[in-house]
Amino acid sequence: MKGSELRQRFLDYFARQGHAVVPSSSLIPADNPTLLFTVAGMVQFNDVFLGRESRPYSRAVSSQKCLRISGKQNDLENVGPSPRHHTFFEMLGNFSFGDYFKKDAIRFAWEFLTQEIGLDPKRMWVSIYEGDEQIPADEEAHDLWLAYMPAERILRFDAKDNLWSAGDVGPRGPCSEIHYYIGDDPDNQVPEGVNSEDDTYMEIWNLVFMQYNRDENGVLTLLPKPSIDTGMSLERLAIVKQGVFRSYETDLFTPIIHTVMELLGTGSDHYQANSSAYHVVADHSRSIAFMIADGLRPGNEGRSYVLRRLVRRAAYFGQTIGFKAPFLAETIATVIDMMGAAYPELRSKQAYIAEVVTGEEERFNKTLAGGLRQLEAMLPNQADKAVFSGADAFKLYDTYGFPLDLTERIVAERGLTVDLAGYEAELEAQRARGRGAAQFKKGAVTERWAERNLAPTSFTGYNELESWGHVLALEFDGEELGTVQRGQEVAFVLDRTPCYAESGGQMGDSGVLVGPHGTIVIDDVQKPVPGVFVHRGKVSKGSVSLGEQVTVTVDAARRRDIVRNHTATHLLHRALRDTLGDHAEQKGSLVAPERLRFDFNNQKGLSSEQLQQIEDQVNAWIRADSKVEAAEMALPQARELGAMALFGEKYGDVVRVVTVGCGNASDHIHTNSEAPVCSRELCGGVHVARTGEIGFFKIVSEGSVASGVRRIEAVTGRAAAEWVSQQAQLIRTLGDKLGAQPGKVEEKLDALLLDQKARRDEIERLRGEIAAGQVDSLLAQKIEQAGTPLVVARVEASDADSFRRLGEQLRDKIGSGVVILGTVIDGKPLLLAAATADQVKAGRHAGNLVKALAAKVGGGGGGRADFAQAGGRDAAALDQALAEANGLL
């Protein structure tokens, strides 16, 4: 049974038992900073179990994407040599939130394993909790299991194996593990094999019975609504059901391994000699595909660094078996072919995944050769030592991008180990330096700025783009100086400035400072301490000193682009609420000079009609040239006016309210033709004086950023004009290619599509006629074999679907008999067998016929008694296999 079928059968079985089928959550846990990655199916239900969240269902089932590659649950080093360890795996799980408990959980598990997928009960063992001074032995589970298996197969273990807890405080409970014997001879089973080093006894399913709660004082109480959390590895279940010993021999991995062999042009001997490297590539290809699909990119911190390690580790092992150029996009394409139906995000992001992983491989390949040379140069310095320098290991990582585990592997081949303490010391020193360099990142609050107790900066930029001020602080490379010189990248604070500091989504200004002896080009302005505007820039001329009076001028063109976009976000917000409802509140924004980005609450994507309506409304308000005003007032007064406060922002007693329109008709110049706008928001940003200054508003994209949160990106002013010009040029180019005037491009495309459809319909009609003729021709070849009408033939088929349809048509038209067909598609042999109902009753079995024939072409398969298909690897053996088909009856 294929892995994909096992997954679907699991979901379908529990759906029939009243469980809501819940899609897998992301590998990146939502709102859980304690977890680097999702490691179990229950992670997405954690708040439900803890009573913090309610769902519209009380029982659920899922197939959860999981990654175990860090901390205690780190399988990375075992991946490759181990037959069953993986970084990525799928956890099948069923869950009860105060609904059913042990009786049904055990019944469901037994029914699924023995009845739904046909596992042998005589190979099954279960474990229960033996109890301790606080939690008694789980006699309830023991007695429930007795209904399904003899007492000698119900084993008792301690807390290490059979007690689950969420931590020192919180829910906990006994668990019951289901183990399966995969050895050759079931008569050799002994109880001592369970939870031992004997890997012919394999745990496949863990049923957790959450029935207690432990408080801060260590006191245990029964939960008012006990719950169920179960987990079963699809990879392990495939081992059991497919009758193999290693997960890499299941169909969850063999297609990836075959892709590697095809790319290298190698055979089974090469694979057997280098199986660990093949397994690393196969395992990591799955992890990499899902990590990128879930939004990660390779980097040097946190989750991004884990992804970089995996890509580079896979690339390195690939090179050890013969790859010279990037190859992971090809193995990942196989992963997507296999898993894209179950996880559509893989297919939708396939091109992006390939681009990201290939780029990272190329970067690694550029540094690998130099890194290896550097490592070789370092090794003589380690003479007569058993430990490789941690400082050198860090240099390989920092300069050449060598992950630590890669260095460990290479030096281990020379009999050395890495000084991990020294490596960590170097890494922490770099992080400390990085924290100092990161002072201008958004939201960064540097302790040294707070300690200086600087007076709040007076912002003059609401009314002017140039003003004078005095230098209060100067900083270079983290140190406070009295004077900064040409060429230095500096930070400085003035007592007053026209430059806006980044906040509320609006980017900081750029500009120039001119003093009596020097000039600083300003790149950015931030507020690391409330009220203190820290400017960042480079001294381009002379020097600047503390106390000097200077003149600061804002980049006017950039500021105009920013204010257009900022006022446009207010208009967009108003239009969204008017179109979608008041729930469409702002969740975040970016106001940059070249574009605006606006995140808002909405459960589903917007239709083309809705987007056009919103865009038209905003442009109507722009054409109305309504007045934009700002006023400071008490917070209660602002609320009385209906001013919107945004996404949990904290406000003082006095707030700034930006109002667009909302006044008399005279506030809107074009009141005869346009509906006036009325928008009031609490906002500290800078804006246009009238909406007409925005010029033009154009939505360029709409999509999802999180559950229930949508994002619109748009352009205004100069950027909008450029966008429209680019689109017009695109239409002209398409017109040239289609031989049509720009205004006729749509008409020409419609005509081409209609013609294409007509041709496809004609092709399908002709295929139908050919198939009908082929059916009649094949029926004419019918023979009698052992009293059974039989058609055996090799046929031509364009694809697997047409091959299957031909077999079904023959079976339906033969009346009574058996059909056996073979074909070759893309160089691979395919076989099918079909039997009419009366022949099935007479004992004919299409699945058995196909299984026997598939073995002759180097494949396997089977299926139902009335219809079955199988594939193989040896197309040259197909004719001989068909020639021997008669003898199978």
UniProtKB/Swiss-Prot annotation:
InterPro entries registered for this protein in UniProt: aa-tRNA-synth_II/BPL/LPL, Ala-tRNA-lgiase_IIc, Ala-tRNA-ligase_IIc_anticod-bd, Ala-tRNA-synth_IIc_core, Ala-tRNA-synth_IIc_N, Ala-tRNA_ligase, Ala_tRNA_ligase_euk/bac, DHHA1_dom
GO molecular function terms listed in the Swiss-Prot or TrEMBL record: alanine-tRNA ligase activity; aminoacyl-tRNA deacylase activity; ATP binding; tRNA binding; zinc ion binding
Keyword ATP-binding: yes
A Pfam family it matches: tRNA-synt_2c
Co-factor: note: Binds 1 zinc ion per subunit.
E.C. numbers: 6.1.1.7
Enzymatic reactions: tRNA(Ala) + L-alanine + ATP = L-alanyl-tRNA(Ala) + AMP + diphosphate
Location, primary (coarse class): cytoplasm
One Gene Ontology cellular component: cytosol
Keywords: Aminoacyl-tRNA synthetase, ATP-binding, Cytoplasm, Ligase, Metal-binding, Nucleotide-binding, Protein biosynthesis, RNA-binding, tRNA-binding, Zinc
Localization per record: Cytoplasm
EC category: ligase
Keyword Aminoacyl-tRNA synthetase: yes
GO biological process entries: alanyl-tRNA aminoacylation
Binding site for Zn(2+): H566, H570, C683, H687
Cofactors, names only: Zn(2+)
Protein task: Catalyzes the attachment of alanine to tRNA(Ala) in a two-step reaction: alanine is first activated by ATP to form Ala-AMP and then transferred to the acceptor end of tRNA(Ala). Also edits incorrectly charged Ser-tRNA(Ala) and Gly-tRNA(Ala) via its editing domain.
Family label: Belongs to the class-II aminoacyl-tRNA synthetase family.
Domain remark text: Consists of three domains; the N-terminal catalytic domain, the editing domain and the C-terminal C-Ala domain. The editing domain removes incorrectly charged amino acids, while the C-Ala domain, along with tRNA(Ala), serves as a bridge to cooperatively bring together the editing and aminoacylation centers thus stimulating deacylation of misacylated tRNAs.
Name the UniProt record assigns to this protein: Alanine--tRNA ligase
Taxonomic source organism: Herpetosiphon aurantiacus (strain ATCC 23779 / DSM 785 / 114-95)
